[in-house]
Amino acid sequence: MPVRPMCLAVLCLSVLLPASAAAQYGVRGSVPDPATGESYHLEVSGLLWSPTPTLLISSESLGIAGDQIDFVNDFGFENTRFRQLRVALRPARKHKLRFEYTPISYSSEGLLSRSVVFNGQRFDISLPVQADVRWRAMRFGYEWDFIYRDRGYLGLLIDTKYTDVQASLENRIVGREFVSARAPIPTVGVVGRGYVLPNVSITGEFSLFRLPEGIDENYQGRYYDFDLYGTVNFTDNFGAQGGYRSLTVFYRVDDDTGDLKLRGMYFGGVIRF
């Protein structure tokens, strides 16, 4: 079984098995006893994410096909640590409104080991080139926990992931050339949480979007988002988090393409009210 579905399956079992045991032994009308950190209406997380990037982009202009540029290998982009903000508003026990913002930025200057065509212009190996990639990743979503227990839950995710990517190359001869891709992307997914200790939880979620093939071969799109993390709650109002995030975006618009991946560990803190 693939690792991601297996992780979510384990979380599902951690939620469902206690409920089955309670039903088997006739537990009825028990008083809710939420785990530490589950009694809140507003949750705010500040995280530091250190992903390993894959950034493959090509851009056509004026009928001139562009080369696929590997911004990591061609320009030596290094792993960078990014700040991430997550906010969850919880008006009711099983319902959450979620927001997330991650500003992503890479920049490097150097000599190319090969000549490339980008946005209709040729960048040769003889001159230094300034390369920049900016990616604003935002998320607006709703979570419905259709199974909710004191020691875990299983829920449905409905999100809009707003992606704003801009890549540019610049040198003294050509000047600055850039390409951008902006779009709100609807995704659906699942989320599950289980408590391994009264104050320690493991949470996993996976959401996706895939444009059906065959509609128009000039337009393609895929979006996959996997997140697995643990939380240690010191009190109901404060905790520490650490986990692994994998974000994959692929798009094709006519002859412009982008294949973007960010995968890596993160850590931070969470406060609740």
Residue map of PLM features:
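Cleavable N-terminal export/targeting peptides
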Residues: M1-E38
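Short glycine/proline- and aromatic-enriched beta-strand/turn motifs that initiate or cap beta-hairpins
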Residues: A23-I104, G268, R272
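Residues on the lipid-exposed face of transmembrane beta-strands in outer-membrane beta-barrel proteins
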Residues: V44-G46, L85-L89, F99, F140-W144, ...
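Outer-membrane beta-barrel pore domains and translocons
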Residues: S45-P51, T102-I104, D145, D159-T163, ...
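Extracellular/periplasm-exposed beta-strand and loop segments of Gram-negative cell-envelope proteins
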Residues: T54-T80, P103-R136, Y162-A183, P212-Y219, ...
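Repeated loop/turn-to-beta-strand initiation elements of outer-membrane beta-barrel proteins
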Residues: K94-L97, D150-G152, P198-I202, F234-A240
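Predominantly the C-terminal beta-signal and adjacent terminal strand-loop region
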Residues: Y224, T231-F273
